[in-house]
């Protein structure tokens, strides 16, 4: 059971998460369990998109589509033929896919370059109109610190999932400053971006406008490349 540490901070474990996963009806079909769009995988980092899309499927999404660089399509289909894959050369290719999902993940394997920047900019412009759940991770978080994104208004159904280094960039402080007071850092990020914050690391912190949750699980087993792309 979720344990209160203070009136505003609650501790949770994997058991708490498991209890809140809805049970599926025997008559359920793929259309009952959501359509997830994963926007990920710039040149040379197709694996990040492939792993993110695969983890979405394993987490229970009924349908998953990966939007990535065209050169990664064949690798994705070879590994996960059940995941739909679309190639994107520019922001127009993204717009054609935005009417389909009811949840979006963007950022794994994206970088500070023109392709990633135009894709993320178009996404943020369009989803503020739709207000569907969007999770931003990795390269998307770095891009949020760019001047071009400084006046973007993010809605409160968005989730930002920085590790300490990304959080430091977002708050313009050192990583040591983030780690010194992780709860306060998460609160500052929430206030700055008006989103749900998941500050990753030992004792992952989830922070929204009203409450803070502290994860009691986790360890050094996750300290390998790729785990961030599936979290």
Model-identified regions with their sequence ranges:
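Small-residue (G/A/S/T)-rich helix-start motifs and N-terminal tracts that mark the onset
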Residues: 1-133, 142-159, 164-231
């Amino acid at each position: 059971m979720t344990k209160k540490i203070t009136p505003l901070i609650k501790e949770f474990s994997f058991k708490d998460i498991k209890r809140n996963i809805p049970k599926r009806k025997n008559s359920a079909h793929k259309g009952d369990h959501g359509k997830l769009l994963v926007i990920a995988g710039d040149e040379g980092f197709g694996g990040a998109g492939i792993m993110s899309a695969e983890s979405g499927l394993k987490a229970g999404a009924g349908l998953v589509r990966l939007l990535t660089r065209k050169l990664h399509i064949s690798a994705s289909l070879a590994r996960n033929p059940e995941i739909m894959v679309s190639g994107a050369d520019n922001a127009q290719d993204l717009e054609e896919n935005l009417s389909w999902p009811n949840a979006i993940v963007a950022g794994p394997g994206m970088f500070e370059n023109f392709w990633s920047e135009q894709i993320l900019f178009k996404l943020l412009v369009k989803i503020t109109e739709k207000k569907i759940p969007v999770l931003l991770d990795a390269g998307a978080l770095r891009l949020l610190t760019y001047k071009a994104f400084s006046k973007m208004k993010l809605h409160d159904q968005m989730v930002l999932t920085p590790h300490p280094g990304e959080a430091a960039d977002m708050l313009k402080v050192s990583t040591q400053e983030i780690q010194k007071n992780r709860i306060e850092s998460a609160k500052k990020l929430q206030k700055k971006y008006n989103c749900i914050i998941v500050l990753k690391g030992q004792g992952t912190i989830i922070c929204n406008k009203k409450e803070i949750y502290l994860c009691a699980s986790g360890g050094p087993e996750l300290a390998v490349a790729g785990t961030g792309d599936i979290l």
